[in-house]
């Protein structure tokens, strides 16, 4: 979450007249994240999140994102719910941006996830995949293999200013992934951005997932690979196999991985590291100074790319053979 577009109390008040959520008492911007502008609203009837969708978010995708949240909640998954306007719509206009309000999810994200948190996230992710199996809408992943090289080309000429040799490394990884990306693995709705700041906890109990604005239809095991990257590396960039084993144990306790999915996990994890390095690199080089946004270091995922190159099997991530479907 982040703030790119500022709003004032007068225009916010006019926008809120289209909702039945009580009287506004306070609001503040939320700085974390890189995609859309987000505000925490407090009203006489509770707390809500207001999102203004910035240029990276295609308005045509909003019915997918908001409809998915509704669908998952009906299937028992804890996540924010879109608040319907008085005219029956879920999307309005504020400060020249498409905007929506969703319910506030209780809990907090874990800055230092434990093994228990990793297991809970794995289990929750599998429940999300099963809950989304009958969601009728589809959305192409706009940040998957065919999109990585065009994105890379936007940053390529400046990449070696971030790390000498990064151009050669990234070119080699993209060549490898283009030749080895798996086909015919199970697909469905994936979160695609399930980092620690998108999972809320009350103690060790998972209270729900947020920020579904990268959700799409893609390889289910790729979502697992994203989580291995996001949850199982320590501050010194070392991989924590105990956390990885817990995340995989949690996931496979609900949805066992097929042998093909397990075999593909090292390639998928390497691809996930490249994907997040590329978007971080682009933002690192292009987000203007003074923006109310926390830029994230792409080198974290360069180190992840280097780690995944050495991995030969999912067992090295902590996957046990009994967690693979026969």
Curated annotation (Swiss-Prot):
It catalyses: L-homoserine + ATP = O-phospho-L-homoserine + ADP + H(+). SUPFAM superfamilies: Protein kinase-like (PK-like) (SSF56112). InterPro entries: Aminoglycoside_PTrfase, Homoserine_kinase_II, Kinase-like_dom_sf, Pseudomonas-type_ThrB. Pfam families: APH. Gene3D superfamilies: 3.90.1200.10, Phosphorylase Kinase, domain 1 (3.30.200.20). Pathway: Amino-acid biosynthesis; L-threonine biosynthesis; L-threonine from L-aspartate: step 4/5. GO terms for molecular function: ATP binding; homoserine kinase activity. Its EC number is 2.7.1.39. GO terms for biological process: threonine biosynthetic process. Keywords: Amino-acid biosynthesis, ATP-binding, Kinase, Nucleotide-binding, Threonine biosynthesis, Transferase. The keyword Transferase applies. Belongs to the pseudomonas-type ThrB family. This is Homoserine kinase. The lineage of its organism: Bacteria, Pseudomonadati, Pseudomonadota, Alphaproteobacteria, Hyphomicrobiales. The gene is thrB.
């Amino acid at each position: 979450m982040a703030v790119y577009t500022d709003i004032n109390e007068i225009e916010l008040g006019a926008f809120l007249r289209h909702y039945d959520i009580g009287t506004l008492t306070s609001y503040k911007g939320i700085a974390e994240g890189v995609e859309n502008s987000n505000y925490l609203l407090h009203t006489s009837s509770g707390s809500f999140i207001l999102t203004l969708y910035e240029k990276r978010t295609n308005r045509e995708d909003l019915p997918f994102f908001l409809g998915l949240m509704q669908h998952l909640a009906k299937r028992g998954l804890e996540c924010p719910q879109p608040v319907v306007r008085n005219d029956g719509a879920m999307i309005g206009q504020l400060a020249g941006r498409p905007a929506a309000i969703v319910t506030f999810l209780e809990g907090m994200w874990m800055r230092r996830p434990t093994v228990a948190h990793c297991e809970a996230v794995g289990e929750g992710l599998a429940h999300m995949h099963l809950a989304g199996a009958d969601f009728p809408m589809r959305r192409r992943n706009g940040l998957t293999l065919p999109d990585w090289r065009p994105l890379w080309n936007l940053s390529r000429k400046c990449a070696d200013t971030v790390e000498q040799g990064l151009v050669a490394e990234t070119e080699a990884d993209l060549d490898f992934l283009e030749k080895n990306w798996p086909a015919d693995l199970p697909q469905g709705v994936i979160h695609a951005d399930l980092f620690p700041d998108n999972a809320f906890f009350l103690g060790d109990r998972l209270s729900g997932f947020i920020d579904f604005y990268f959700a799409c239809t893609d390889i289910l095991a790729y979502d697992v690979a994203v989580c291995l990257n996001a949850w199982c590396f320590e501050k010194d960039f070392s991989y924590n196999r105990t956390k990885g084993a817990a995340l995989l144990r949690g996931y496979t306790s609900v949805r066992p991985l097929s042998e093909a999915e397990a075999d593909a996990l090292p390639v998928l994890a390497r691809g996930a590291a490249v994907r997040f390095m590329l978007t971080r690199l682009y933002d690192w080089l292009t987000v203007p100074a003074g923006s109310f946004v926390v830029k994230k270091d792409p080198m974290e995922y360069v180190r992840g790319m280097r780690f995944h190159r050495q991995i030969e099997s999912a067992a090295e991530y902590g996957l046990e053979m009994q967690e693979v479907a026969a």
